Structures are given as structure tokens and as C-alpha cells.
């Protein structure tokens, strides 16, 4: 039964639910077959049984099926076009895997062959409960569908099996066409053709609303989908809800951009629409031009992809290492601010932070400009949200790679099964019921169980005579696990389990029974239990843990965003003591403080302030370092007579000292990012050697720069991405060094005519930079400008800066009779 111009591999549609079907089988049972003609039984003669014989050459059609010609082309209003069929079809029968779920061709049903010459198919009768029975009667291969007469002697009707099959086929074909059209917004009536014309797909324009609806429903765009001007990506409104609540003929398949612009952003904060509009989006025009420059400057496709991915990543919040959850708070803050300006419809060029779906869309739009083959698929390796999206780029004719836009911008990954599997190509109809999600209980009993076994085993270890560390062997076993099994548990949020959690039950029982027989080796009550963090970090037992009583605090010599700095005497030596302003730390914060102290303890470099120890007991948490007599570089540069005291060569040497110290920090494993590099955090000794300090405390800083009460926390030295509260890396320190070099070259205070809020607006959001004097050494000016590049990845490293400064220092001639006072 082939239909010209249409596919023939559609499955039959099942109308009735499973509990309406009763099967009586003799011999080898065929599975259920659901009839679709129960509502039309009144159209046939009651009490007569219509018969059709299946011969090898074809069928003898029932007269009610119409006259001659192709039976499938008969125009019968009681088949496909009748409203009774549409009304009787529940949406709950739909499935994403095929046109309709539970098809009569799915499962184990074996359809009788049409070429069986001797099979006689009798008509179907319907009892009052709309059920029917299948049975084998007689001998041989005869399949008889027994008719159940009406118990009241009423009328019964019958249709041949072929008519029912044809009716099912036509109805399901119509529904499949409708659902596919709704899901894909296909304007081409031949979109079901197996081999589409690629040239036609490239040249046929699609309206912005059509492509927007396709992406809204499917979350995917193919290589041949060009994102037109006026395209908008909606979020916060479910397509299924929209389809149920509105009239498609009046309101359209997707909310129009005009109706979205009329929505008050305060009514529904979750609704957003990111629009691609080249005419009214100047920031996007700038991106358009930059993409052309990238395309012209790069030789290979891989270089283009790499540069384009880094451009998008840096523009939309930078890379994140631990997952996209780091971007969510910044994204909410960004979109809330933009909604106050643009309401619900936000231009894509105005986004300073973007999630994976925004980055994928921008990559697709810019890739289309330079004809880079790119498609958007559902799913992301950095998040598990339903609206997650990723970009894949095609290399040649048979290779495609996933472009990383979140964690490692520009890196090419092999696409996994989630992106190339059935979910990426299946039609997702808005008429389909949303897939229910499992409801998580309010109490996670698995975590409670882990905590229970962890607590129980900790008791075993504390009172275990074999434990020669009196209660701390548990922690060493946890953190020194060579197998890495506990690390996987910790990543899942469940914490680390003690090794005994993996014991067989009998071993666990034996360990618990030892509590009664074990001697009590716990320390006496009067003896303080050693601090777990101190033991873990190695601070106890050496001179790094300084008792507060050993310090003789003297005059105050400075203040910072973390506290006050005092000169003190410790065992006859001058030291600097930085007393932390925030002393009310929780145990977790104290441990974090101790970890930072441990990092500082391991640093040894002539341009790093020497760490001497720490006071680790609240309320006197303090950092003890070497004392540098000349104070901060900021004070030295901005006092009277600085130009006479600090000649050009000395100032360049000071810049070189800062670069050496920062290069040492950035080349540590793992790298140490200062995050608060500025002239007040640079100290000068009596020989004018500059040393970096305060690099280990930036992670403890809970307040923002605007809440700081001293000049040490002002944003004059901060990089634009830091001012925008975006993720940053070591290149933010390079920007800060550029401000310090400008400070050394001009002996001026950066942004002295602006308050902190104005600096944030000028540098972070208006891309303003300090003015470089025209009479400044061009080579020094070039270094400063390189450090101030808006894209962090374009800024030089400190090793490169050292190479650039070294010849400048040699060429600068010191003035005669200079003395290092």
C-alpha cells in the first residue's frame, strides 16, 4: 500500500486505552489491535457482516469505502477530516519517540501479511463496552475476528480490516504532519522528503519568528539555519503552556516581539527575551566588525574558532572552572539590571554575563556572519538545566567538534552521545505533555546515613587503641586516600566517608564491639585537643604559630581593607602585625584562614614580603611579616619631593621588582592570583626594593570594594572584569600592574578626580582608561596600554613584562651623586 509522494513507514495509531481491550486467544496469540472505527459503526448496515478477502493480487474493497480508484485518495469526511477523530484523541497518547505512543505496530504485535491467499478476514463487531476479541478459529492459518453482537439485539456494524488499517494510516499521517509542522515551523510542504536539497536550504529565507519558534520549542538550530535579524530567544515561558492557553490563530505559535516589549518586567521577573538586532544594537555591530577582523587575520578554521570562542567567553563573564553555577548569581544580577532599562526584551550585545545558552547563541550568530558551519544542540557539559545549549562546529564534511565556551574557551571536545543522540534530532512538539521530573524529598536520607556512619566510625577511631594519633587518624585516612574514592564522594556533595564505610558488615560490627574493650586513650579534659586544621596544615609544633602574648604591639603604621597594621617587637626583632578586622569567624572560615597562612608560609622570594608566622587563635587572628621601614609604595610616590628622590631608573627598577614578585606567584603550582594588587599593597625596604604583600588574603575578603573604608580597597587599580564582578584570572593582576606602572611613570594618583562609584562606571562599564602623557617614553606607554587591553587573554604575562622592562632599565642613566638614603 504505497502512497505516491508520501512516506509509507508510519505506524498505526491506537485510540483506545489498554484497559478497554480484551483478547481471547486460541493457539498462538497475536497481540492487541485497537480499532479506530468504533465511532463510525452507525455508518454501516446494522446486523450485516461485511467481508473482504485478501487475495495474492489485492483486496476486494467494501462498498462503503467508495468507488473505484485508489482507496487512500477517497474524500470521506468521516475519516481524517471528521472532528470526532480529533476530539477523541487525547494528548496523553503522544510520545517523543514516534508520532504516537503505544502504536499497534510497536511491541510484540505481528501484523498479518496482505499476501496470505487463504486467510479470510471477517468483519469486526463492537459490543457496548467498545471492546473486541481476537481469536483463531478453524484450522490452518485462518484469522477470524469474532463479532460480539449487541446483547439487546441492537445494530452492529462492521468494517474490513483493510479499511481500519487505511483509516489509521490516514489519521496518523495527518497528525504526524501537524505535529511536525508545529514543532519545526516548516514552510516547505515537502519537508518530509528523505533527501533535502542543501542549496535550497541555504537560499530559502526563514522569518525571524519562524526560527525563533523552532529554537524555542526544540532548543536546536542546524547548520543550515541562519539566525536572521530580529531573532529572539525566549526563556521563562513554557511552549506547552503557551499552546494550551492561547488561540494559535490569534496570538501565533510564539509571543510576538511587540507583545513582549509591552510586558512589564516587574510582573514576571523570570520572563526574558534576548534579541539579535543589528540595527539598534551598537555593541553587536562592534562584535560584527571584530568577527570580520578575526576571520581575516586567522589562517585555519581552528584558529577562527579559538579566537571567536575566547571573544564570546570574555565578553560574557569569562571562564568558570567549577561549573556554570558560578555564573548564575552574576547572571541574575546582570539581567535584573538590564530589565530596568530594556524591560523584557534585551539586546544580545548588552549582555556582560551569559550562561551557556546565551554564549551558544552568540557564537552561532557570529559564526553565520563569516560562514563558519555551526549548529546548536541541547545539553551542556557544565550544567544540567533543561535549557542548556552547546555549539558544534563542522570541520570538513565528516567531522564536528564541540566548542567549549564556558570552562576552557576555544577547546574542541569530541561530541558525546548526549549531543549526537536521538534527543538532539527528535521532534519535540509543544503539544506534548512535559516530561515529569522526580520529586526530591526535603530530607536527603542518603546524606543522613553517610553522616551517621561517619560519626559512628569517628568514635571508633578516637577510642581505638591502634590509633597512635589520638583521634586524628580518621582525618589523615580521609585526605590521604591514594585511591581517590573519597574524592568522588566529596564532589557529589556528600562529603568524605571514612574508610570503614566501605567495610563489610561483619568488620563494621567488629569495630563497633571494640569500643567496650578498648582502653580510654582520649586526652584528659584539662588538656586541649590539638586543632585539626593546625595538624593538617603543619602549623603546630613549629615557630609559625605565634602566641599573641609574645608580640609587643607598638604604633599603628597602616590600615587596609582587612584590618590594621602595627609595628611590633617579637623576640627582639621588628615585625609588622596585621590584625584582621573580622574576628568572628566560623570554624570553616578559620580553616580557610589557616590554609592561606600555609600558602604564605611556603613562599620564598626577594620580592615577596617574608611571612614569619600567624596568630591563629581568635580574637587575635593576625599575620606577622617582616617589617619594611619605608612603608608602602603608594605613600612613597605621592609624598612631596618624590620626583627628586625617585629618578626614572629607580622607578623602572621598582616596576621590575613588582613584575618579578608577581611572576613568581603566577608560576607557582597552583598559581597564586593576587586579586588586590595596588601600590598600597607594595612595601619598600631601606634599599628601595619593592616587595609584594597581602596576596594570600584576597579570598577571605567578604565585602565588596564599595564598602571599604580605606584607600586600600578602592577600585582605581582593579581590572574591568573585576569591577563588573565577573570571573577573573591572573590577567587581572596584569591590568593592576599597568596602573602601578602608570603611577610610577607619572607620579600621579590614579583617578584622583573621581570617587569610587565613578571609577567603577568609567572603567568597568564605559571602557575608560587613564590618560597617558604624550611626553612619556613610548616603550613604557606601550607596556601600559598592553596591560590595559579590555580582553584579558591579550594582556602580556609578567615574564614578558620583565623582558620589556630589562632593556629600559639598562638604557636609563642614573643621575650623579645619587645616594640610597
Swiss-Prot record:
Q: Which organism is it from?
A: Arabidopsis thaliana (Mouse-ear cress)
Q: What protein is this chain from?
A: Serine/threonine-protein kinase CTR1
Keywords (alphabetical) are:
ATP-binding, Ethylene signaling pathway, Kinase, Nucleotide-binding, Serine/threonine-protein kinase, Transferase
The reply on keyword Cytoplasm is no
A GO molecular-function descriptor: ATP binding
Record field: compositional bias (Low complexity): 14-25
Encoded by which gene?
CTR1
Q: Which residues form the Protein kinase domain?
A: 551-809
Q: Which GO terms describe its cellular component?
A: endoplasmic reticulum membrane
Amino acid at each position: 500500500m504505497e502512497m505516491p509522494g508520501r512516506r509509507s513507514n508510519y505506524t498505526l495509531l491506537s485510540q483506545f486505552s489498554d484497559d478497554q481491550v480484551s483478547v481471547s486467544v486460541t493457539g498462538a496469540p497475536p497481540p492487541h489491535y485497537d480499532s479506530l472505527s468504533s465511532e463510525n459503526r452507525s455508518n454501516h448496515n446494522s446486523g450485516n457482516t461485511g467481508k473482504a478477502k485478501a487475495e495474492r493480487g489485492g483486496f476486494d474493497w467494501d462498498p462503503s469505502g467508495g468507488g473505484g480508484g485508489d482507496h487512500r485518495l477517497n474524500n470521506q469526511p468521516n475519516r481524517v477530516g471528521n472532528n470526532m477523530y480529533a476530539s477523541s484523541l487525547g494528548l496523553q497518547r503522544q510520545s517523543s519517540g514516534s508520532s504516537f505512543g503505544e502504536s499497534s505496530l510497536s511491541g510484540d504485535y505481528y501484523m498479518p501479511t496482505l499476501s496470505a491467499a487463504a486467510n479470510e478476514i471477517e468483519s469486526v463487531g463492537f459490543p457496548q463496552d467498545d471492546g473486541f476479541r481476537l481469536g483463531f478459529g478453524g484450522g490452518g492459518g485462518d484469522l477470524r475476528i469474532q463479532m460480539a453482537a449487541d446483547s439487546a439485539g441492537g445494530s452492529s456494524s462492521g468494517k474490513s480490516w483493510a479499511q481500519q488499517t487505511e483509516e489509521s494510516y490516514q489519521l496518523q499521517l495527518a497528525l504526524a504532519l501537524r505535529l511536525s509542522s508545529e514543532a519545526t515551523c516548516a514552510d516547505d510542504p515537502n519537508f518530509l522528503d528523505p533527501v533535502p536539497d542543501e542549496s535550497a536550504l541555504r537560499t530559502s529565507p526563514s522569518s525571524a519568528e519562524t526560527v525563533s519558534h523552532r529554537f524555542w520549542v526544540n532548543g536546536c538550530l542546524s547548520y543550515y539555519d541562519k539566525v536572521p535579524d530580529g531573532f529572539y530567544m525566549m526563556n521563562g515561558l513554557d511552549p506547552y503552556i503557551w499552546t494550551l492557553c492561547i488561540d494559535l490563530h490569534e496570538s501565533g505559535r510564539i509571543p510576538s516581539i511587540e507583545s513582549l516589549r509591552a510586558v512589564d518586567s516587574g510582573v514576571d521577573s523570570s520572563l526574558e527575551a534576548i534579541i539579535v538586532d543589528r540595527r539598534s544594537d551598537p555593541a553587536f555591530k562592534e562584535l560584527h566588525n571584530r568577527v570580520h577582523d578575526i576571520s581575516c587575520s586567522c589562517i585555519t578554521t581552528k584558529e577562527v574558532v579559538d579566537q571567536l570562542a575566547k571573544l564570546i567567553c570574555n565578553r560574557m563573564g569569562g571562564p568558570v572552572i567549577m561549573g556554570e553555577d558560578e555564573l548564575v548569581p552574576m547572571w541574575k544580577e546582570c539581567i535584573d539590571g538590564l530589565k530596568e532599562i530594556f524591560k523584557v526584551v534585551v539586546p544580545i550585545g548588552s549582555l556582560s554575563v551569559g550562561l551557556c545558552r546565551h554564549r551558544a547563541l552568540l557564537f552561532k550568530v557570529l559564526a553565520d556572519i563569516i560562514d563558519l558551519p555551526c549548529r546548536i544542540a541541547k545539553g551542556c557539559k557544565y550544567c544540567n538545566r533543561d535549557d542548556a545549549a552547546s555549539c558544534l562546529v563542522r570541520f570538513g564534511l565528516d567531522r564536528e567538534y564541540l566548542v567549549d565556551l564556558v570552562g576552557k574557551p576555544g577547546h574542541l571536545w569530541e561530541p558525546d552521545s548526549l549531543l549526537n543522540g536521538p534527543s538532539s534530532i527528535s521532534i519535540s512538539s509543544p503539544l506534548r505533555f512535559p516530561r515529569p521530573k522526580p520529586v526530591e524529598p526535603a530530607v536527603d536520607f542518603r546524606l543522613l546515613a553517610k553522616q551517621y556512619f561517619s560519626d559512628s566510625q569517628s568514635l571508633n577511631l578516637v577510642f581505638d587503641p591502634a590509633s597512635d594519633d589520638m583521634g586524628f587518624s580518621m582525618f589523615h585516612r580521609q585526605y590521604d586516600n591514594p585511591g581517590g574514592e573519597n574524592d568522588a564522594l566529596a564532589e557529589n556533595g556528600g562529603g568524605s566517608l571514612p574508610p570503614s564505610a566501605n567495610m563489610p558488615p561483619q568488620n563494621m560490627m567488629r569495630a563497633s564491639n571494640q569500643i567496650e574493650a578498648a582502653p580510654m586513650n582520649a586526652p584528659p579534659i584539662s588538656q586541649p585537643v590539638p586543632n585539626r586544621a593546625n595538624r593538617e596544615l603543619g602549623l603546630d609544633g613549629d615557630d609559625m604559630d605565634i602566641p599573641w602574648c609574645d608580640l609587643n604591639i607598638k604604633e599603628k603604621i597602616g590600615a587596609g581593607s582587612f584590618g590594621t597594621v602595627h609595628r611590633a617587637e617579637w623576640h627582639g626583632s621588628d615585625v609588622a602585625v596585621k590584625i584582621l578586622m573580622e574576628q568572628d569567624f566560623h570554624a570553616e572560615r578559620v580553616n580557610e584562614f589557616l590554609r592561606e597562612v600555609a600558602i604564605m608560609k611556603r613562599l620564598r622570594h626577594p620580592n615577596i614580603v617574608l611571612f614569619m608566622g600567624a596568630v591563629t587563635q581568635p580574637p587575635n587572628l593576625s599575620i606577622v611579616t617582616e617589617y619594611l621601614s619605608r612603608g608602602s609604595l603608594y605613600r612613597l610616590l605621592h609624598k612631596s619631593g618624590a620626583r627628586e628622590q625617585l629618578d626614572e631608573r629607580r622607578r623602572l627598577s621598582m616596576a621590575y621588582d613588582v613584575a618579578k614578585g608577581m611572576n613568581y606567584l603566577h608560576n607557582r603550582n597552583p598559581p597564586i592570583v593576587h586579586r588586590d594588587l595596588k601600590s598600597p599593597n607594595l612595601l619598600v625596604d631601606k634599599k628601595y626594593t619593592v616587595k609584594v604583600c597581602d596576596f594570600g588574603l584576597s579570598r577571605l575578603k567578604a565585602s565588596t570594594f564599595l564598602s571599604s573604608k580605606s584607600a586600600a580597597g578602592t577600585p582605581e587599580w582593579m581590572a574591568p572584569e573585576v569591577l563588573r564582578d565577573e570571573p577573573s584570572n591572573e590577567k587581572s593582576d596584569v591590568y593592576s600592574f599597568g596602573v602601578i606602572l602608570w603611577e610610577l611613570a607619572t607620579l600621579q594618583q590614579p583617578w584622583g578626580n573621581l570617587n569610587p562609584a565613578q571609577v567603577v562606571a568609567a572603567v568597568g562599564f564605559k571602557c575608560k582608561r587613564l590618560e597617558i602623557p604624550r611626553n612619556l617614553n613610548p616603550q613604557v606607554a606601550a607596556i601600559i596600554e598592553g596591560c590595559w587591553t579590555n580582553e584579558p587573554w591579550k594582556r602580556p604575562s609578567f615574564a614578558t613584562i620583565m623582558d620589556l622592562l630589562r632593556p629600559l632599565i639598562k638604557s636609563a642613566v642614573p643621575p650623579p651623586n645619587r645616594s640610597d638614603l
